Amino acid sequence: MATVREKAVALDLCATYSPSQRPPGPNGSHRPFRATYIWSSIIQVLYTQVEVKKRRHHLKYHHDCFIGSEAVDVVFAHLVQHKYFGDMDIPRSKVVRVCQALMDCKVFEPIVTACMFGREKKRTVFEDSSCSLYRFLNSSNLLGVQVEKSNGRCTPQRPKHSSFQSASLQSPSLEDLWDNLSLTPADPTHINLTSNLPPKVVAEVWQEQTIRRLLQLVDLPLLDSLLEYTPVAPRIPNVKEEDHNLTSNYLDREILKAFSDAQADEWVSAAVDCLDFLPDHMVVDVSRNLPEQQAPDSKWKLLLFDTIGKHYSQNRAPLLRNQLFDIHTGIAELLVNGKTEPALEATQLCLKLLDSPSREEFRRLLYFMALAADPSEFRLNEETDNRMTVKRMFCRAIVNNKSLSKGKCDLLVLFILDHHKDVFKIPGSLHKMVSDKLVAIQQGTDPDRDTGYTFCQRVDKREFDSAAQNNTRTELCALLKTIYENNSLSPKEKKRLLGQFYKSHPETFIQYFGDRVSSVYT
């Protein structure tokens, strides 16, 4: 059987359907066979949607990298949103296998290396993790990864000259790949090919569906906090301020990074990454108080831990904002009742509502906390173990609300710490809900026709009015009974309250007391 690349060459598809080209229009003109088209669209969406930027991991800086879990999220959303496989539920594990196939076919490569017997060896298994980094093999063709000065993020631009040569699909054909994944492409007439919705609309749908899914998982007494939730806009730095920082504080931060590079310790690397979110004066203090190279590890590790802990122990807004306090309480209740799976999904949704800088800050802090809490690492406190020391130091930085008991705060923080590799993933249920809503908007149908889970029954107006009157009458009778049978009220006070009730609701009063009306109220 001919390989996919041979088929593409025979059909002259390399240039036409490379990631640099837009997918074919809804009319399906010049469309390659279905699996090749799906593969091409996956590669294109990876190039254009994953966040590619300089990242630090395993004591080194790596340029033009993206995170493994984010690649899975992007591919997952793309497959579900465009309904390439109809309404079939696609588990996240199969999307991971798709990413594994992309890596095997040299679309991208892992840059994180494992040291074995003094030699560095590339990982061969794709990891759905926020700690695994990858790089496109033809990243040189990703014209100018532009850096947004407002938040330092890098976004890849669509390559102008790129083909399948860098991603030569030489293993089984794409049809065989989908067969092995137990996924069958839908009929081409049902494949959603249009994606012309404005980014603002897509972002609003993501937030709306995230809130809707949270309401399905967590029982909330009030909805105001969710309905009025607006992410905090990232701060736009002043150009003059930025120039000043480059001259006065940039050197101190670079000294710290060079110091951590000289230490073969992931603990130190994670700590220095957290310093990016600390104010300049604290970073300057750390850089100018670094111990000598001959000093024991405990001295400078304790300096880093105390500095980070001091910053997050200050009176500042918690990373899990109090605006979503009811959600945090609901997650804690799920944990108390032993419902860990819905608690994990609710936590993932809650973190999805955070703005990008806050998510990145929380991710770095959580990774550092996980390393520092390891019992095999440097002992932070002689009296308590590392896990409890880390929890006590950073608990208020994550959740800080007086209405939530200390026990539930500790439970929630330790749960997030134990699942730090999973809490930033996007649940598959949310992908499905967003996909259905976007498809409905694109097709011009009512996007709220199918609301998913239903907690009430639709009734007509006559039935609603009747139920309202009956329920009101029942509650009024219960109130009247409470007043009449309350022995703590004086006869004068009781007579006054009964008189007010009779003047406001005479029919209910007469119905309740019947022939005794004259003796009760005269």
From Swiss-Prot:
**What GO terms in the biological process aspect are recorded for it?**
intracellular signal transduction
Q: What SUPFAM superfamilies is this protein classified in?
A: Winged helix' DNA-binding domain
**Known CDD domains for this protein?**
DEP_DEPDC4 (cd04446), RhoGAP_BRCC3-like (cd04405)
Disulphides: none
Cite the DEP domain residue spans from the record: 46-138
Q: Which family does it belong to?
A: Belongs to the DEPDC7 family.
PANTHER family, per this entry? DEP DOMAIN-CONTAINING, DEP DOMAIN-CONTAINING PROTEIN 7
Protein name, entry field: DEP domain-containing protein 7
Source organism of this protein record: Xenopus laevis (African clawed frog)
